[in-house]
Design a protein with these regions (language model features):
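Structural motif
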Residues: 1-2, 19-27
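A short linear-motif detector with a strong N-terminal bias
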Residues: 8-9, 16, 120
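Scaffold helices S1-S3 of the voltage-sensor/voltage-sensor-like domain
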Residues: 13, 17-20, 41, 47-48
Length: 160
């Protein structure tokens, strides 16, 4: 596994925990883990398990998680979160201006769980009822959703 792939696993866990309203320090620990792996100049997967703690910012707990990822390709906590977490919420982070905090707000206040829910809420002008969201953001999100839909449609017409 490449460092970026390993870091993405930690980022996924951090995003799901943050959207789910988990403890700030726990979320930050997973974000720091992703950063430590991403910033490491050589392949983490090529290190012997007993050398993981040589990576700046990696303690015994993170070293154990790294060993699990290298051995299994995933983290048990990520697998468990994916079982219970609405996958559509994670897909929303690919849209501009939507990070975990804003996605949590949308889920909590407007019960948005996926792109379709978001599109309906934007078209109804519901986002502007939330502080920090406005008409301009609604327009940009609608454009992003339309572009995404256009890309998907173009892909479908090209593929047999």
């Amino acid at each position: 596994m490449r460092n970026e792939e390993i870091a993405r696993l930690f980022d996924d866990v951090a995003d799901m925990l943050e959207i789910g309203g988990d403890n700030f320090f726990r979320v930050r620990a997973y974000r720091n883990a992703a950063r430590a792996v991403r910033d490491y100049p050589s392949s983490v997967a090529d290190l012997a398990h007993d050398r993981f703690q040589e990576i700046p910012g990696v303690g015994s707990d993170l070293a154990a998680k790294l060993a699990t990822i290298i051995d299994t390709g995933d983290l048990p906590i990520r697998i468990e979160l994916l079982r219970t977490f609405p996958l559509g919420l994670l897909e929303l982070k690919n849209l501009p201006m939507l990070g975990p905090k804003r996605i949590k707000l949308l889920a909590d206040r407007l019960h948005i769980r996926n792109r379709d829910d978001l599109k309906r809420a934007v078209e109804a002008g519901q986002l502007r009822t939330i502080r920090g969201f406005g008409a301009r953001m609604e327009e940009q999100l609608l454009e992003a959703l339309a572009r995404e839909l256009g890309v998907l449609c173009d892909t479908e017409t090209v593929l047999p």
